[in-house]
From Swiss-Prot:
Belongs to the gamma-glutamyl phosphate reductase family. Pathway: Amino-acid biosynthesis; L-proline biosynthesis; L-glutamate 5-semialdehyde from L-glutamate: step 2/2. Its EC number is 1.2.1.41. It is found in: Cytoplasm. One of its GO terms (biological process) is L-proline biosynthetic process. This is Gamma-glutamyl phosphate reductase. It comes from Brucella anthropi (strain ATCC 49188 / DSM 6882 / CCUG 24695 / JCM 21032 / LMG 3331 / NBRC 15819 / NCTC 12168 / Alc 37).
Length: 427
């Protein structure tokens, strides 16, 4: 692996070669059979378990560096691997193997009056670049998902997890080799310098078809700003939970606690709670007391503080803040119209949920809010590819082009048209 001391020209040359290898591997991978791809995935899962000791030793090196660098406990937790987490990674790869193969699926077909038969068929995207921070499991998830969808992938993880990711990558390559697929179909960037990211964002001379960033706001913002190829991403998850006056209170209380507190550091965690002003006297205080009992800090608007003085005053900045912590901003709104207005003003278009029994209110919520994921009577924390039955996800996209919401194997494909005739001409 190169070091940060390498020159920009060296890095550009190395990355160009990575791109060439990925593009060369993409061609045979695109026509690999379902059986081949599944055999590679299952062999990779087996190799992951066989290499458990090596992976844990590599992870110890990364953890020691993290401790030396004074990294936060939450960072260390994301970085750490143990027997259980390695088993979960292997299980996740097997789950991806069990998914239907999207490649070659006929999405639609029809006949024309002139006798032409037209089919729209799923095809791989080609080469995917995945840029992520120090989560070793993303190495396995991204590699496996791209393989299942017939794509070559270039993985660039954070330098803090370099040893762990390299050990996991070896297991993925063993899987490819066991199935007779090109080892270069899953590559890990051999450069620690951040200049490698810049080269990927340029597209590696046309080698990369799409970039998927997985990480914090600064990483995603850089990718979205600098990328010269399409990007599947979300900048942040400012997710809202609206409690309508028609909501069942017991249900609302359970959903509010889960949406905020189940895991506060994920992009699907609720950051703002909106309560129908018409139900505030009955609904607001019990819900906030439940959240406070779980050590959640409440930041409320002036009318919320009037009913729940224990809250801290919310500022304008709070309504557009992704806390990723045990903090929630709370406001009263004038029914479904007020909720829609607030959400459309402050949302990052990731995930929003409504708790209501009024079908008309739910219909307006679904129709008038333009976010990637909308839920009714369910926690925002279901915003997850696994929970959607996708097996896993490479990320969540909030853009409107191609992929939106959880990005699983189907979203990692494009399509082409097959047109069958029997001698038709347009003359």
């Amino acid at each position: 692996m190169l070091t940060k001391a390498e020159t920009a020209n060296d890095i550009a040359a190395v990355m160009a070669e990575v791109g060439r290898k990925a593009r060369a591997a993409a061609a045979p991978l695109s026509i690999a059979t379902t059986e081949q791809k599944n055999r590679a995935l299952i062999a990779a899962a087996d190799a992951m378990l066989e290499a458990r000791g090596d992976i844990l030793e590599a992870n110890k090196l990364d953890l020691a560096n993290a401790e030396k660098n004074g990294m936060a406990a939450s960072f260390v937790d994301r970085l750490a691997l143990d027997d259980g987490r390695i088993s979960a990674i292997a299980d996740g790869i097997r789950a991806i193997a069990a998914l239907p193969d999207p490649v070659g699926e006929v999405i639609a077909e029809w006949d024309r009056p002139n006798g032409l038969h037209i089919e729209r068929v799923r095809t791989p995207l080609g080469v995917i670049g995945v840029i992520y921070e120090s989560r070793p499991n993303v190495t396995a998830d991204a590699g496996a998902l791209c393989l299942k969808a017939g794509n070559a992938v270039i993985l660039r993880g954070g330098s803090d997890s370099a040893h762990s990711s390299a050990a996991i990558h070896k297991a993925l390559v063993r899987g490819l080799e066991a199935a007779g697929l090109p080892a270069d179909a899953i590559q890990i960037v051999p450069v620690t310098d951040r200049a490698a990211v810049g080269e990927m964002l340029k597209g590696l001379d046309g080698a990369i078809d799409v970039i998927v960033p997985r990480g914090g706001k600064s990483l995603v913002a850089r990718v979205q700003s600098e990328a010269r190829v399409p990007v599947f991403a979300h900048l942040e998850g400012i997710c809202h939970l609206y409690i309508d006056k028609s909501a069942d209170l017991d249900m609302a209380r359970k959903i509010a606690v889960d949406a905020k507190m189940r895991r506060t550091g994920i992009c699907g965690a609720a950051e703002t709670l909106l309560v129908d002003r018409a139900a505030a006297a009955m609904h607001l205080v019990p819900i906030l007391e439940d959240l406070a009992a779980k050590s959640c800090e409440i930041r409320g608007s002036a009318d919320v503080l009037a009913l729940y003085p224990a809250a801290k005053p919310a500022t304008e900045e709070d309504w557009s803040t992704e806390y990723l912590d045990a903090i929630i901003s709370v406001a009263l709104v004038d029914g479904i119209s007020g909720a829609i207005e607030h959400i459309n003003r402050y949302s990052s278009h990731h995930t929003e949920a409504v708790v209501a029994e009024d079908a008309a209110a739910v219909a307006r919520f679904f129709n008038e809010i333009d976010s990637a994921i909308l839920l009714h009577n369910a926690s925002t924390q279901f915003a997850d590819g696994g929970e959607f039955g996708m097996g896993a996800e490479i990320g969540i996209a909030t853009g409107k082009m191609h992929a939106r919401g959880p990005v699983g194997v189907e979203q990692l494909t494009s399509f082409k048209y097959r047109v069958r005739g029997d001698g038709q001409i347009r003359g």
